[in-house]
Amino acid sequence: MNNLPATPSPEELMTTPVFQAPETLSPQAEEASTALIAVVITVVFLTLLSVVTLIFFHLYKNKGSYVTYEPAEGEPSAILQMETDSAKGREKEEYFI
């Protein structure tokens, strides 16, 4: 009867890495990993803050920079110039059929 395998102990049953208990870290290693996580979060936050700040200043600086080429209302020379340009354009029209 010695040839029959004995029932494995619970520790032997947990042979896959998924079921094995995780190794406990030393306090120094745990502090180091916590510090690393804090540094990564801080760098990401500062990067996002700087990008938002740059976008804000860019939008503030370029506010109202849209330029139109239309004459201001009330300028008679500009209105006269527009009328003469349209008259010249009518003289040079060609129609192809």
From Swiss-Prot:
One term under GO cellular component: cytoplasmic vesicle membrane
Post-translational modification, as annotated: O-glycosylated. The O-glycan is modified with sialic acid residues.
Glycosylation sites: T7, S9, T15, T16, T24, S26
Residue ranges, Cytoplasmic side: 58-97
UniProt superkingdom: Eukaryota
Keyword Transmembrane helix: yes
Keywords linked to the UniProt accession: Cell membrane, Cytoplasmic vesicle, Glycoprotein, Membrane, Sialic acid, Transmembrane, Transmembrane helix
Membrane topology listed for this record: Single-pass type III membrane protein
InterPro entries in the cross-refs: SMAGP
Compartment(s): Cell membrane; Cytoplasmic vesicle membrane
Annotated TM spans: 37-57
PANTHER family: SMALL CELL ADHESION GLYCOPROTEIN
Family recorded in the similarity comment: Belongs to the SMAGP family.
Main function: May play a role in epithelial cell-cell contacts. May play a role in tumor invasiveness and metastasis formation.
Protein name: Small cell adhesion glycoprotein
Encoding gene per record: Smagp
